[in-house]
């Protein structure tokens, strides 16, 4: 066992040869390197598979031996300072290693097909390999300096991948936004590391925890300064894990390729912030004010992410805000000291969200053949719909991921979510109300995404009832419009169906888009002159096997990964696999491992949470079920006229919520107004001062000297005798002034 741990330092370096060789090959031998593109893909998957096997073996050993292993090498710079670097293997490291490698391998397989058409195929895999290497180095680091080094590398790789299609201005701006936002967090993290080193004199995790505990117990540290340093450490995870108010970069990060969105949201970029808070929890837990701040930021992010997801029309942005909300749940759990539920939720969310993102990528890949390669169209849920019979495997996988994120048993997210909700009830009733309400909102917006994407008919060919071409009828009232509109209060269905026969009614457009090999043509019946008319339309096809295989594997994870946290005894919840694995970390946090609810209380809480989720699904179904089914009941929409004033208030509320969600809570607008525009205004003023004042003085001296020289040259006629006369005159005047001041002293 000890022999195995001694070789753990090699884990981050196993995948590293691929990005290095790819970089050298593309620089020196581009033709040969590109001709072997599939070989590089296979090599990347093979090397990461080795790391996965190694990680699983370490986790199994830790379950049975319950140990923490650390190995450190010291580099002495002088007698007063030495830099130590090494690796740290504990349950948290093992969990993160498995998440990174399993999701990473599936994303690599998926990307081989998804990025096959892209000219930057090899560049993408080079970035991806370096990304996984950086994340592996981060989770195995033994001290804060190493963490910060790999923290920056993870950020750099994410910026490169977010701006992968840098020729698109939107992608380039998203890359810059992610970079600038994370600069704030990274600067805070660096200040916190330096402050903590000034207090303790060490960067090593275990030394830090022990020294800080002793200083607090002996009252030998300024608690205010220690709290400030701890908060600065927390600022880094706030930005990296997209917590309020530094969350604004995450939705725009969807401009990168979809496989990267899956990796960032499941096991790398945003998971890094949760990992660091979990790693530093023994430090934070002895500072109650910091724990409360962590939980407060978490609960705000939970609610904000859920409300901002309500009206998104871009399928990836909707999932991005969902990630933001779920990361808030994890941060809330860590702030409450619920170490095990937080990590359990990190695991279940990683596989469920990776499944959803890869599913959305499969949908986008299929839709591109119909609507073109514009993200505004291929990712727009309002142009989707009716995909169930065209992409059945993708639909099934996406439905399982959606149900998991809704918290429906026995899927993965149900088990971890319930533990956080139970702990929030004990921590704060207000936090519990918000957390439970957000669970219902999660079910609502996730099923909204599912219904708009898969149910009904393909809305690309849909024409609204006014006869004007529109993206979809959903844009009238169901939050999928490109611009703000009020609900039509005078809309009635019966007059529409009893109009003059000379007028034509069609629910589908005449225009079709460019056809590619990834489409099928089908005959569809439309309503035209109240008779039957057959037309041929083109629909998406199911994706290739290399795209479907990773989704099916993630589907299995989503179905069964929750079992690692399910107890198999009736006395308590202390004999599940996850608790057994986390025993060393739980002991380090001095938690009472016997403080668990019984099965009866668990069933009560589970019934309540599932009821909330089902209610959210029911509301989503009522609002977003296919409109065509309501044609069977012609009084459905006309019954709205009986609402009178209540209907008006309801519409105002709907538009208020829509405007809040569609405009991202006005937070981006606030940052743009208060920060971006003010900084630009200040920059313009500084530019004016620099060019007009500073440069003016410098240029003025030069121009004056030039002018005096030219005048002198003109007067003297360029004669040497005149220059000598002026020189002697200046010397004489200088001597007279010196003589005058010298004799004045006497």
Swiss-Prot record:
Which regions span the lipid bilayer?
9-29, 40-60, 89-109, 125-145, 147-167, 185-205, 221-241, 258-278, 280-300, 327-347, 354-374, 396-416, 425-445, 547-567, 608-628, 722-742
Question: Membrane topology for this entry?
Answer: Multi-pass membrane protein
Coiled-coil region: none
The chemistry this enzyme catalyses reads: a plastoquinone + NADH + (n+1) H(+)(in) = a plastoquinol + NAD(+) + n H(+)(out); a plastoquinone + NADPH + (n+1) H(+)(in) = a plastoquinol + NADP(+) + n H(+)(out)
Which locations, inside or outside the cell, does it occupy?
A: Plastid, Chloroplast thylakoid membrane
Sorted keywords for this record are: Chloroplast, Membrane, NAD, NADP, Plastid, Plastoquinone, Quinone, Thylakoid, Translocase, Transmembrane, Transmembrane helix, Transport
Which GO biological process categories is it annotated with?
Answer: ATP synthesis coupled electron transport; electron transport coupled proton transport
Q: Which InterPro entries match?
A: NADH_UbQ_OxRdtase_chlpt_su5_C, NADHpl_OxRdtase_5_subgr, ND/Mrp_TM, NU5C-like, Proton_antipo_N
Its Enzyme Commission number(s) read 7.1.1.-
Q: Name one GO molecular function term.
A: NADH dehydrogenase (ubiquinone) activity
Any matching Pfam family: Proton_antipo_C
Q: Name one GO cellular component term.
A: chloroplast thylakoid membrane
Q: Which domain of life is it from?
A: Eukaryota
Identify its protein family: Belongs to the complex I subunit 5 family.
Assembly state and interactors? NDH is composed of at least 16 different subunits, 5 of which are encoded in the nucleus.
User: So what does this one do?
Assistant: NDH shuttles electrons from NAD(P)H:plastoquinone, via FMN and iron-sulfur (Fe-S) centers, to quinones in the photosynthetic chain and possibly in a chloroplast respiratory chain. The immediate electron acceptor for the enzyme in this species is believed to be plastoquinone. Couples the redox reaction to proton translocation, and thus conserves the redox energy in a proton gradient.
> Mind telling me what this protein is named?
NAD(P)H-quinone oxidoreductase subunit 5, chloroplastic
Q: Which organism is it from?
A: Draba nemorosa
> Lineage of the source organism?
Eukaryota, Viridiplantae, Streptophyta, Embryophyta, Tracheophyta
């Amino acid at each position: 066992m000890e022999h195995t741990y001694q070789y753990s330092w090699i884990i981050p370096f196993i995948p590293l040869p691929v990005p290095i060789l790819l970089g050298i090959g593309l620089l020196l031998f581009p033709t040969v390197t590109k001709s072997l593109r599939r070989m590089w893909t296979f090599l990347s998957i093979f090397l990461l598979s080795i790391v996965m096997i190694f990680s699983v073996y370490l986790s199994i050993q830790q379950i049975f031996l319950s140990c923490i292993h650390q190995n450190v090498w010291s580099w002495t710079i002088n007698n007063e300072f030495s830099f130590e670097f090494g690796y740290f293997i504990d349950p948290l490291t093992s969990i993160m290693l498995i998440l990174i490698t399993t999701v990473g391998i599936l994303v690599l397989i998926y990307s081989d097909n998804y990025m096959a058409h892209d000219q930057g195929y090899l560049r993408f895999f080079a970035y991806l390999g370096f990304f996984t290497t950086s994340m592996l180095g981060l989770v195995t680091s033994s001290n804060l300096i190493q963490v910060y080094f790999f923290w920056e590398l993870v950020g750099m790789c994410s910026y490169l991948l977010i701006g992968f299609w840098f020729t698109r201005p939107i992608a380039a701006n998203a890359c810059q936004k992610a970079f600038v936002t994370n600069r704030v967090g990274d600067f805070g993290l660096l200040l916190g590391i330096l402050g903590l080193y000034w207090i303790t004199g060490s960067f090593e995790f275990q030394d830090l925890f022990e020294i800080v505990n002793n200083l607090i117990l002996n009252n030998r540290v300024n608690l205010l300064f220690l709290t400030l340093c701890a908060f600065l450490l927390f600022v880094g995870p706030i930005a990296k894990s997209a917590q309020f108010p530094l969350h604004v970069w995450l939705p725009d990060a969807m401009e990168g390729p979809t496989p990267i969105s899956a990796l960032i949201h499941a096991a790398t970029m945003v998971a890094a912030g949760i990992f660091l808070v979990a790693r530093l929890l023994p430090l934070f837990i002895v500072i109650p004010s910091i724990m409360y701040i962590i939980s407060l930021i978490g609960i705000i992010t939970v609610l904000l992410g859920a409300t901002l997801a309500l009206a998104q029309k871009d399928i990836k942005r909707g999932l991005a805000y969902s990630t933001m909300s779920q990361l808030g749940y994890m941060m809330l759990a860590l702030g409450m000291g619920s170490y095990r539920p937080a990590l359990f939720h990190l695991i279940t969310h990683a596989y469920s969200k990776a499944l959803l993102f890869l599913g959305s990528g499969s949908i986008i890949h299929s839709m591109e053949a119909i609507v073109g390669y514009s993200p505004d169209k291929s990712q727009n849920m309002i142009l989707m719909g009716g995909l169930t019979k065209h992409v059945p495997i993708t639909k099934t996988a996406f439905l399982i991921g959606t149900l998991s994120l809704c918290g429906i048993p026995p899927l993965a997210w149900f088990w971890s979510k319930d533990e956080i909700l139970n702990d929030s009830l004990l921590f704060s009733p207000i936090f519990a109300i918000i957390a439970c309400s957000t669970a219902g909102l999660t079910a609502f917006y996730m099923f909204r995404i599912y219904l708009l994407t898969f149910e009904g008919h393909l809305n690309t060919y849909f024409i609204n009832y006014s006869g004007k071409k529109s993206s979809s009828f959903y844009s009238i009232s169901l939050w999928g419009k490109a611009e703000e509109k009020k609900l039509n209060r005078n809309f009635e269905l019966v007059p529409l169906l009893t109009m003059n026969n000379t007028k034509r009614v069609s629910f589908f457009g005449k225009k079709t888009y460019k056809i590619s090999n990834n489409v099928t043509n089908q005959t569809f019946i439309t309503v035209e002159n109240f008779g039957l008319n057959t037309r041929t339309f083109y629909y998406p096809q199911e994706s290739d096997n290399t795209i479907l295989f990773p989704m099916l594997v993630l589907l299995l994870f989503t179905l069964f990964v929750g079992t690692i946290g399910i107890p198999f005894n009736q006395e308590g919840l202390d004999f599940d696999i996850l608790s057994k694995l986390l025993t060393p970390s739980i002991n380090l946090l001095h938690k009472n491992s016997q403080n668990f609810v019984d099965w009866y209380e668990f069933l009560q809480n589970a019934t309540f949470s599932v009821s909330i989720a089902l209610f959210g699904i029911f509301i989503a179904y009522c609002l977003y079920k296919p409109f065509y089914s309501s044609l069977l009941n012609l009084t459905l929409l006309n019954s709205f006229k009986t609402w009178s004033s209540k209907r008006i208030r309801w519409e105002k509320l709907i538009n208020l919520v829509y405007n809040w969600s569609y405009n991202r809570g006005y937070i981006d607008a606030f940052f743009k107004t208060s920060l971006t525009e003010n900084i630009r205004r200040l920059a313009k003023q500084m530019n004016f001062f620099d060019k007009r004042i500073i440069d003016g003085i410098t240029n003025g001296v030069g121009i004056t000297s030039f002018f005096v020289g030219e005048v002198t040259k003109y007067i003297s006629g360029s004669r040497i005798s005149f220059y000598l006369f002026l020189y002697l005159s200046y010397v004489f005047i200088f001597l007279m002034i010196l003589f005058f001041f010298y004799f004045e002293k006497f």
